[in-house]
């Protein structure tokens, strides 16, 4: 399963960093890994957050989302996740841009800038990659239901 590969990559990276980090008195990096899970019917949702940075700088953050149907041994697409809530990706795009406007953020240009997941409260959540005023994209996490 794809999630096992991702978790194994993180484990290998942490072991490698740990091996190279002695002595700890001069270690200047921070690693943060966290995850949440939710189960709905036969589907397991996992949200994995990774953050890395030097003590004196900002973090580089990445979010990874998995929706695994263990009954069919398959992963769900964003449109399938939206379908669990009786919605389609057109509705998702409209809701995301409405929420971004309320926050004063730039709208996303298409559904390719959105990743869907289900949080531990079984709410449909969007990770929208919106344009930063400083350049580049950043994630805005939006609860849609």
Q: Where are the regions that the model predicts?
A:
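Extracellular/periplasmic catalytic domains that process cell-envelope and extracellular macromolecules
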Residues: 38-40, 59-60, 117-118
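Sec/Tat-exported extracytoplasmic proteins
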Residues: 11-14, 18, 22, 72, ...
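Short, surface-exposed charged micro-motifs
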Residues: 34-36, 65-67, 113-115
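Long, charged/polar, surface-exposed segments that mediate recognition or autoinhibition
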Residues: 43-53, 59-100
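Short aromatic loop motif centered on NTY/YTY
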Residues: 81-144
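Active-site acidic/histidine clusters and adjacent loop/turn architecture
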Residues: 1-46, 50, 122, 128-134, ...
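Residues that act as N-cap/strand-start positions at coil-to-secondary-structure junctions
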Residues: 29-31, 62, 108-110
């Amino acid at each position: 399963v794809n999630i096992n590969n991702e978790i194994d990559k993180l484990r290998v990276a942490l072991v490698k960093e740990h091996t190279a980090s002695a002595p700890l008195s001069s270690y200047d990096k921070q690693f943060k890994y966290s995850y949440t899970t939710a189960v709905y019917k036969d589907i397991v949702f996992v949200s994995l957050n990774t953050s890395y940075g030097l003590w004196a700088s900002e973090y580089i953050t990445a979010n990874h989302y998995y929706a695994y149907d263990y009954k069919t041994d398959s992963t769900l697409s964003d449109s399938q996740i939206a379908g669990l809530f009786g919605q389609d990706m057109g509705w998702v795009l409209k809701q995301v841009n409405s929420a971004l406007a309320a926050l004063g953020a730039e709208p996303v240009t298409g559904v390719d800038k959105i990743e869907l997941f289900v949080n531990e409260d079984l709410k449909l959540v969007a990770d929208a990659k919106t344009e930063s005023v400083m350049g580049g994209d950043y994630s805005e996490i939006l609860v849609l239901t």
